[in-house]
A protein has these predicted regions:
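A residue-level marker of the well-folded mature domains of exported/periplasmic proteins
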Residues: 1-260
Length: 260
């Protein structure tokens, strides 16, 4: 309605957003959803879905859990909206590694629903802490959203458990501030994925302007931080805002400048 040429969309609600995507595409707007799969078909409902390798993230988390908990673990997994493709695929990834029954998934299945909302994440995690006397590992695909709830472990007289998650400066600094008082609080992160949208924007702009379309159609990132591996230290930048993602290609300083 406003005459835009290209639209990049994070369809966090999944298939519920498909009609809106299709409407934009049929109106001639270059339409590029990214990250969460909205269903539908490229060339029919939108131009291209730019995904991410969430299965690989899950495998990375699974390998880390297996290495650090060889005797098994009780695992609590938190993701976004119910049924979102990101959480489902991540679960498939780490379950492909954690095949032994000694690795027990607790909480709602296949994951605790948080809508990636920090307030709801805090409510969900607080309830889980009260319900489960043993939580060995928390898996979260939006790690920074849990920072407000993690102190509930200490209030209950328990160490914050090990955590595999997506990165964020606020999470890294929380770990730095609390690791000494919480002996079980190991942390491994994968990139939160700011560069996933970078690739989606590159596709949208190229297609709308007749430019060179990128050859990559999906984004993936390696393990970013691992408190058990000196080669991948947890990186807290107290001189920068907490809401930054140091795994991104854009520097923390440039991100901070954009947020002013």
């Amino acid at each position: 309605a406003k005459g835009i040429d290209a639209l990049v969309v994070f369809p966090d609600a999944g298939p519920a957003m498909l009609p809106a995507l299709r409407s934009a595409y049929e109106a001639g707007v270059v339409t590029v959803p990214y990250r969460v799969f909205p269903d539908g078909e490229a060339g029919v409902d939108y131009d291209l879905w730019v995904g991410a390798d969430f299965f690989a993230d899950g495998v990375s988390w699974g390998n880390w859990i297996k290495a650090n908990f060889p005797d098994g673990a009780k695992i609590l997994f938190l993701s976004g909206p119910a049924g979102n493709s990101q959480g489902v695929t991540e679960r498939e990834g780490f379950e492909s590694v954690l095949t032994d029954a000694k690795y027990e998934m607790i909480g709602e299945q296949p994951f605790e629903v948080t809508n990636w909302d920090p307030a709801l994440s805090q409510t969900v995690l607080t309830a889980a802490i009260a319900k489960y006397p043993q939580i060995d590992v928390i898996v979260s695909d939006f790690g920074p959203s849990l920072v407000g709830a993690l102190p509930e472990f200490q209030k209950a007289g328990r160490s914050i458990p090990a955590m595999t998650a997506s990165d964020g400066n606020v999470l890294a600094c929380f770990w730095e501030d609390n690791k000494d008082a919480n002996p079980d609080f190991k942390l491994m992160t994968v990139p939160t994925g700011n560069d996933n949208v970078r690739l989606a924007v590159q596709h949208a702009v190229a297609r709308a302007t007749g430019g060179v379309v990128p050859t990559e159609t999906a984004w993936s990132g390696p393990v970013f931080e691992d408190s058990t591996d000196p080669a991948k230290p947890v990186t807290c930048r107290t001189d920068l805002p907490g809401g930054l993602y140091l795994s991104a290609e854009m520097s923390g300083e440039d991100q901070a400048e954009l947020l002013k």
